[in-house]
């Protein structure tokens, strides 16, 4: 095999590959063995046609495509490795020369990983956020726990206040006409939650049970239903019931109800403080790492290939779809509800995708510049961690992953981030 790499504009180039005649002959032989099983000629059993007769009847050209299908998946990766390039998209293959008894020549037009010119990445001067947890933070968290344990109790008298839950009927009208989806009966709404159109909930404050009112609002310009967006509407509302939150006492009994591992409010308070400290620490760490990576990538010069951005966009869209599925929704329903098609979603994600790609390329370059390597022991430790997380034997994890090359690259990128943190 002979290989020639010609760099073209940007990150594109052409790989010219010559496969020796003997290797091409072997591929033709294998192609014949496959094709002959599907061909019938009078006087011969299927699969038993002599090679010479086959080529006389159909021509050797009938074997070329199958030979290429056998050859290219083997020879193209070899050529890539020999040329020392890292393609980031599928190659555009053109066969330049194909003839029985001769060498095969093909070209592959590909986009490769770009060169990274690193800027400053040490001493970036980014500090970690303060992770101090105050008594006020702890009390606010305990208050939130109280809120979550609150019971809704019917108010026998008094008017609607912020935070109350009202049970109401409503019907909406635009230009005097009722519209689809604008009517409900015995609907529970927490006033101040922002669940309804801006201005709707505010106008319920001060009403008493049994009250009726015309609530005048305007649909937001960006409202998902285009036929209602930006239009004024009137909702005829009737209040049936008003409920107020009744908070449990903040005492030892409350503490035991919240956490069976504690006996007193003091223990719950201490445990809450430690949990908040850990959460703040993790949040500050994540923010620091994100800011360092962003700054280092902003300082680097990289011509990011569109092919890499497109691949990242596809990955991000799949991640988004998985999150939707966890919420009981799918991408099709989301696009119908939001009025955005897949192309519009990708356009929204494009800037983040470009940042992700540039950040990853920068981290790979830092790992190379600083000679950061990943040992087999570190890979084994990561496999063990995954096995524990999924409650599976390590061998099963290894079989599922196959090659650990991608894991090594991921660990190397993590080491690059650790390096930024240590040398900030």
Swiss-Prot record:
Entries under Pfam families matching the protein: FKBP_C (PF00254), Trigger_C (PF05698), Trigger_N (PF05697)
Domain PPIase FKBP-type, residue spans: 163-248
* GO terms, molecular function: peptidyl-prolyl cis-trans isomerase activity; protein folding chaperone; ribosome binding
Q: Name a biological process GO annotation.
A: chaperone-mediated protein folding
User: What is this enzyme's class at the first EC digit?
Assistant: isomerase
Q: Which InterPro entries match?
A: PPIase_dom_sf, PPIase_FKBP_dom, Trig_fac, Trigger_fac_C, Trigger_fac_C_sf, Trigger_fac_ribosome-bd_bac, Trigger_fac_ribosome-bd_sf, Trigger_fact/SurA_dom_sf
Concerning PROSITE patterns, the annotation shows: FKBP_PPIASE
Q: Does the keyword Chaperone apply?
A: yes
EC assignment: the record states 5.2.1.8
Task: State the compartments where it is located.
Answer: Cytoplasm
Reaction catalysed?
Answer: [protein]-peptidylproline (omega=180) = [protein]-peptidylproline (omega=0)
Q: Name one GO cellular component term.
A: cytoplasm
Recite the UniProt keywords alphabetically: Cell cycle, Cell division, Chaperone, Cytoplasm, Isomerase, Rotamase
Primary location class? cytoplasm
NCBIfam families (alphabetical)? tig (TIGR00115)
Role: Involved in protein export. Acts as a chaperone by maintaining the newly synthesized protein in an open conformation. Functions as a peptidyl-prolyl cis-trans isomerase.
The UniProt entry, under PANTHER family, shows: TRIGGER FACTOR CHAPERONE AND PEPTIDYL-PROLYL CIS/TRANS ISOMERASE, TRIGGER FACTOR-LIKE PROTEIN TIG, CHLOROPLASTIC
Q: Which family does it belong to?
A: Belongs to the FKBP-type PPIase family. Tig subfamily.
What's the domain remark here? Consists of 3 domains; the N-terminus binds the ribosome, the middle domain has PPIase activity, while the C-terminus has intrinsic chaperone activity on its own.
Q: Name the chain's protein.
A: Trigger factor
* Top-level taxonomy: Bacteria, Bacillati, Bacillota, Bacilli, Bacillales
- Its gene is tig
């Amino acid at each position: 095999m002979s290989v020639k790499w010609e760099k073209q504009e940007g990150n594109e180039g052409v790989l010219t590959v010559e496969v020796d005649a003997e290797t091409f002959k072997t591929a033709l032989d294998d192609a014949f063995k496959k094709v002959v099983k599907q061909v019938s000629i009078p006087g011969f059993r299927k699969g038993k046609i002599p090679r010479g007769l086959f080529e006389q009847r159909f021509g050797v050209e009938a074997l070329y495509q199958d030979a290429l299908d056998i050859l290219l998946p083997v020879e193209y990766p070899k050529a890539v490795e020999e040329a020392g390039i890292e393609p980031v998209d599928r190659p555009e293959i053109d066969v330049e020369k194909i003839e029985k008894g001769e060498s095969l020549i093909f070209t592959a037009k590909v986009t490769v990983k770009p060169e990274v010119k690193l800027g400053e990445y040490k001493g970036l001067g980014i500090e970690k956020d303060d992770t101090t947890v105050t008594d006020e933070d702890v009390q606010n968290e305990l208050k939130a726990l109280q809120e979550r344990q609150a019971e809704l109790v019917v108010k026998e008298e008094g008017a609607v206040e912020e935070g109350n839950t009202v049970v109401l009927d409503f019907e909406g009208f635009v230009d005097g006409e009722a519209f689809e989806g604008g009517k409900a009966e015995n609907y529970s709404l927490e006033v101040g939650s922002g669940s309804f159109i801006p201005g709707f909930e505010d106008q319920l404050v001060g009403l008493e049970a049994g009250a009726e009112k015309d609530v005048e609002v305007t649909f937001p310009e960006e409202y998902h239903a285009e036929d209602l967006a930006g239009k004024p509407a009137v909702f005829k509302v009737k209040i049936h019931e008003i409920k107020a939150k009744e908070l449990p006492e903040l005492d030892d009994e409350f503490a035991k109800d919240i956490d069976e591992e504690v006996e007193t409010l003091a223990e719950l308070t201490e445990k809450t403080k430690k949990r908040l400290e850990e959460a703040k620490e993790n949040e500050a760490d994540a923010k620091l790492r994100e800011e360092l990576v962003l700054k280092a990538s902003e300082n680097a010069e990289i011509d990011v290939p569109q092919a890499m951005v497109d691949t990242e966009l596809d990955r991000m869209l799949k991640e988004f779809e998985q999150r939707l599925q966890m919420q009981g929704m799918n991408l099709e329903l989301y696009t119908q509800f939001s009025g955005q098609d897949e192309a519009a979603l990708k356009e929204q994600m494009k800037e983040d995708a470009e940042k992700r790609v540039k950040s990853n390329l920068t981290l790979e370059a830092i790992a190379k510049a600083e000679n950061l390597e990943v040992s087999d022991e570190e890979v084994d430790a990561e496999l063990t961690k995954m096995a524990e997380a999924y409650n599976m034997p390590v061998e099963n994890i290894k079989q599922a992953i196959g090659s650990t090359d991608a894991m090594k690259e991921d660990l190397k990128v993590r080491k690059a981030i650790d390096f930024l943190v240590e040398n900030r």
